[in-house]
Amino acid sequence: MTKIYNIIITVFISSFVIASEWIGIDSVNPVRFEAKSLNSDIETSEVQFRLNGYTLTEIETPWGTQYKVETEGGSSIMDLGAPDLDQTFASVIIPDNAQMSLEVISSSYIEIENIDIAPSKGNFSRSISPSDVPFNRGDVYAEDQFYPGKLADLRDPYILRDFRGQTVVSYPFQYNPVSKVLRIYTNITVRLSSDGEGQKNVLARSSSLNKIDSEFNSIYQNQFINFEDNQTRFEYLVDQGNMLVICYDAFMGEMEPFVEWKNRKGIPTEMVSVSSIGSSSSAIENYVSDYYYDNGLTFLLLVGDIAQIPSPSISGSASDPSYGFI
């Protein structure tokens, strides 16, 4: 049955794909891949990736017409000289100080035979036109095995304010350039498990988490697929976030009505002058960090130009957002 299905798919592609076309598996219309939490107690989480279809795009290469395979919501692996395939992502909340291991617990796929997948041009600057970058086949094209080989992987842990998270990467497209077989994984289910003490981006809390700002509550819902699972284990009070205004001294009077209006709206707002903090960006960074840990902080507003409120320098450029990295 599988062989028959593969043949039907191959004929369908060669007959109907003209330039770029969505090929539905569970949906006739282009829809984003699905990533959902099957169950999670934070120490262990099971995540399912589902593919409802994919897009094949014809690309003219030095070796003739070949294809780029993509899915809605995915992004190219961008491995120079390797088959140009998409990868998909999902983030989960993990323990504050644990290292996580990953295992694939189930998967299913369909195959497309006799298909040429074009090589990736890699990652390059926006100042370079893609048409100016030549196609090159890497050593992968001489290897009789599926690329990229692994079905899933973990990125380094990160901290997003109240939680420590980790991104799960799935590779639903696997291509063997020698046999010219493309495997499309319609389902990849993985399990993350705590596996010893964490070494990277460990979250050290000064106190237990019992309140979440409403604005960040929405961010967490969109960022972490197991956030709702986490809420069932811990009861958090969703509260209004606060604002700190750092203002150039000469503008303080003009900003008073703004601060008063914010407080009337129910957003606790405090204004301080630059002169009371210090004239350097490091002094402002230290003040913001101390304020965050002492009072909590959701919004930071800087009132003044760079000559009046200095900015941290990142790679030689001013970077106001760096004040938010605590």
Mark where each language-model region is.
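Intrinsic disorder/low-complexity signature
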Residues: 2-3, 210, 317
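Sec-dependent signal peptide recognition
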Residues: 2-11
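Hydrophobic alpha-helical segments of integral membrane proteins
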Residues: 10, 18-19
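Extracellular pro-sequences of secreted precursors
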Residues: 19-302
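Surface-exposed loop and adjacent secondary-structure segments within mature catalytic domains
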Residues: 297-326
